From Swiss-Prot:
TSP type-1 domain residues: 53-104
Keywords on record: Signal
Protein name from the UniProt record: Thrombospondin type-1 domain-containing protein 8
Domain of life: Eukaryota
Organism name: Homo sapiens (Human)
Signal peptide: 1-21
């Protein structure tokens, strides 16, 4: 009795599957419905925030960019992550409109102080 090529491949594939260890990440255990989306996604986002907080330094002081009517502050990467971390620029630099009390050295036409 001749076997089909698919049947000949099935047995080795099943043995390979049984011999291959499964990778289970503890971060992705399902914890049930919490009413605010998928629990796995919440754990993943929490883990990413912990990694970012562990590798980023504190925010620096605000500095005036009065020619642009804005203030800027930044922070630096001070540690290393256990894996690749891709950060958006807003995690390293923040901008806000400048105010007269924050920029006493600026001339009135440099900033919109109504904000």
């Amino acid at each position: 009795m001749a076997r089909t090529p698919g049947a000949l491949l099935l047995a080795p594939l099943l043995l390979l599957q049984l011999a291959t260890p499964a990778l289970v990440y503890q971060d992705y255990q399902y914890l049930g419905q919490q009413g605010e989306g998928d629990s796995w996604e919440q754990l993943r986002l929490q883990h990413l925030k912990e990694v970012e907080d562990s590798i980023l330094g504190p925010w620096g002081k605000w500095r005036c960019l009065c020619d642009l009517g804005k203030q800027e502050r930044s922070r630096e990467v001070v540690g290393t992550a256990p894996g690749p971390v891709f950060m958006d620029p807003e995690k390293l630099i923040q901008l806000r409109p400048c105010r007269q009390r924050d920029c006493p050295s600026c001339k009135p036409f440099d900033c919109d102080w109504r904000l």
